[in-house]
């Protein structure tokens, strides 16, 4: 006798596959070395709770987006993290930025 798969079990298996395959990961920053350095500098600014450095990083990331070196989707995700840090939510911003960085795939 062949066991029957319930719809809920099948849906759970599909959802697990989608989640573990990275379909819901952060936007990718691309291969540009300058973008990598700018995001690394942003992590330092957020980690040290430095508003002035945070502003410089924000400006640099905008320049990279305008130059086509940072995809708009990645810039938007980072801008949201920066806004959160500006509101004083440094630890939450750092955690989100860390997740963004860990979610990057080498191209």
Which sequence ranges carry the predicted segments?
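Short terminal alpha-helical segments
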Residues: 24-48, 94-105
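Residue-level detector of functional hotspots within protein domains
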Residues: 9, 40, 76
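Weak global preference for isoleucine
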Residues: 2, 19, 39, 81-82, ...
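Post-signal-peptide N-terminal segment of Sec-exported extracytoplasmic proteins
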Residues: 31, 38-72
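Sec-dependent bacterial lipoprotein signal peptides
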Residues: 1-23
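Intrinsically disordered, glycine/charged-rich N-terminal periplasmic/extracytoplasmic linker segments
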Residues: 56-107
